[in-house]
Amino acid sequence: MSRPEELAPPEIFYNDSEAHKYTGSTRVQHIQAKMTLRALELLNLQPCSFILDIGCGSGLSGEILTQEGDHVWCGLDISPSMLATGLSRELEGDLMLQDMGTGIPFRAGSFDAAISISAIQWLCNADTSYNDPKQRLMRFFNTLYAALKKGGKFVAQFYPKNDDQVDDILQSAKVAGFSGGLVVDDPESKKNKKYYLVLSSGAPPQGEEQVNLDGVTMDEENVNLKKQLRQRLKGGKDKESAKSFILRKKELMKRRGRKVAKDSKFTGRKRRHRF
């Protein structure tokens, strides 16, 4: 079965018919509610917090935010059809049309926390030739870090296509300044396995609740080790510098009895541009 990200950009894939079908499905409503409750458990927030819902769609996760803890929330999404469906449902939160890959357009320190359900995997997909997934991830995490208060928390449930996408997301978050890691629910199950990115933007003010990091299983060091292990299993090697490559090849030619130029301080250096 094809993933939605591979079929079309989100603003096209979630058209009017898909938005109504998605919102009206009781199965989708149940799954979204379950994942939102799990995200709230990981956030460990005080009541009446101000939350940003990233990729809010038609507001299924926003309804849970209102019901659980009387949180005030604001949602953003790239699909006009999804937002129109949400407006027709008279949600209590505010809705905004925005591509999260272009950044979070809010004043610094606006939100106590942020949540995202089944959305950030879209950032890893290049819909057009000018969309670079790594740049979009960095822009997203940098602007999100700024939009959160000091000690603000972010939990995102997402569906990665492969381990490389998990690595890219985690490393972009670390570079932006977030601490935290990955929580995997039901890791042994192929069907029910769920990935939750659990992050915190610095230390919270004294007396406030800490982000719930129980079950965090991956950090930046483990990601790098995992990547190295995959390279070894695939037979891949670490990148070799141009100079060491040339010296190795010259040594090989010498052993084979070929005539080879002597080494000098200029061996392996790039030539200057003449013009």
Swiss-Prot record:
Alphabetic keyword roster: Cytoplasm, Methyltransferase, Nucleus, rRNA processing, S-adenosyl-L-methionine, Transferase
Q: Where in the cell is it found?
A: Cytoplasm; Nucleus
Q: What protein name is recorded for this chain?
A: 18S rRNA (guanine(1575)-N(7))-methyltransferase
GO biological process annotation, one example: rRNA (guanine-N7)-methylation
List the source organism.
Answer: Saccharomyces cerevisiae (strain ATCC 204508 / S288c)
Function of the protein: S-adenosyl-L-methionine-dependent methyltransferase that specifically methylates the N(7) position of guanine 1575 (m7G1575) in 18S rRNA. Requires the methyltransferase adapter protein TRM112 for full rRNA methyltransferase activity. Important for biogenesis end export of the 40S ribosomal subunit independent on its methyltransferase activity. Required for efficient cleavage of the primary 35S precursor rRNA at site A2. Involved in positioning the proximal bud pole signal.
Any single Gene Ontology cellular-component annotation:
tRNA methyltransferase complex
What would be the name of the gene that encodes this protein? BUD23
Name the protein family: Belongs to the class I-like SAM-binding methyltransferase superfamily. BUD23/WBSCR22 family.
User: Which EC number(s) are documented for this chain?
Assistant: 2.1.1.309
What is the first-listed, main subcellular location in coarse terms? cytoplasm
Q: What is the lineage of its organism?
A: Eukaryota, Fungi, Dikarya, Ascomycota, Saccharomycotina
**Any Pfam family:** WBS_methylT
Any idea which GO molecular function terms this record carries?
rRNA (guanine) methyltransferase activity
User: What InterPro entries does its record include?
Assistant: Bud23-like, Bud23_C, Methyltransf_11, SAM-dependent_MTases_sf
Where is the motif (Nuclear localization signal)? 257-264
